[in-house]
Amino acid sequence: MLFKNKRQSPESKGIPRQTADNSSNNKTAAADHPAAASASAPVYVMGIDSGSTSTNAVILNQNRELIASAVIRTGAKSGESAQRILKEILEKAGLQHSDLIKIVSTGYGRVSIPFADENVTEISCHGKGAHYLNPQIRTILDIGGQDSKAIHLNEKGDVTDFVMNDKCAAGTGRFLEMMARTLEVGIEDLGVLSLKSTENIEISSMCSVFAESEVISLIAQNKETSDIAHGIHMAIAAKAISLMRRVGLEPGYMMTGGVAKNPGVVKVLEEQLKAPLYISGEPEIVGALGAALYGLERVL
């Protein structure tokens, strides 16, 4: 077995954490020029991943150490969400905006972030973030709020292939939210509930509308909520693995995105893959981490 799937804090998953040095001299040096990267003048870069349902940010220093991270819900306007997370992460880090020598954006809303210096695709950023966390990773499954993607990496961490499902919400976090609402269960409770399942129930449709009708029918048949939840997770896993097969099921699996926090989905995926999934301490920040790493490459 390559690795265990137990979630740990970001630093225990390979991201060293350091307290930011916030002296005025260091602020000035870091803001003046990229060459300020030295032992006496810390450099800070920020990566921001503007997704459909969450906006995530990471600040690293010149030693690739994690200074701070943040995750918030994306509102109606991605630009406003970006401003909110900028304020939050700077407060966490004890830094000022002027301390950030580079800001790189990624995700669907990356071009709507006015304070970003440049933007990079989420595929590239997920690949870089995943390889940084664990160089053994070869196949990434990312399930977000409204899309899912599979990415293949080579031993150097380069993206060699990828596929995306962004045409509908089937098998995504939004799909899970709809099913949880139909079951009258909190989305945060759905995964744990499904682990109590004792009967395999098949959900034949991944279309949100038809799947909801199936779930309502199963409720009318007095099926256990835990069994229905397990059936929903089985359907999501089947769709996800079908996506992964298109880039090649090479062992060294990693799952990112908000759905990686659902233990029911993770369990079913591992059973069907017959292998463990590597899940970082905060699976939603992998794209932002990759963006920050790209930022460091630009200035160091």
Task: Walk through the language-model features, giving the residues of each.
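Internal, active-site/partner-interface "lid" segment
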Residues: 186-218
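Conserved phosphate-binding catalytic cores of ATP/NTP-utilizing and phosphoryl-transfer enzymes
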Residues: 11-13, 30-40, 108-158, 290-300
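Active-site nucleophile and cofactor-binding loops and adjacent substrate-binding regions
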Residues: 73-74, 118-127, 141-145, 163-171, ...
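Glycine-rich phosphate-binding loops at beta-strand->alpha-helix junctions
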Residues: 108, 245-272, 280, 284-287
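N-terminal glycine/serine-rich phosphate-binding loop of ATP-dependent small-molecule kinases
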Residues: 1-122, 261, 270-271, 275-277
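Glycine-rich phosphate-binding loop plus the immediately following alpha-helix
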Residues: 77-78, 155-199, 293, 297
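Adenine-nucleotide phosphate-binding core of ATP-dependent small-molecule kinases
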Residues: 211-244, 284
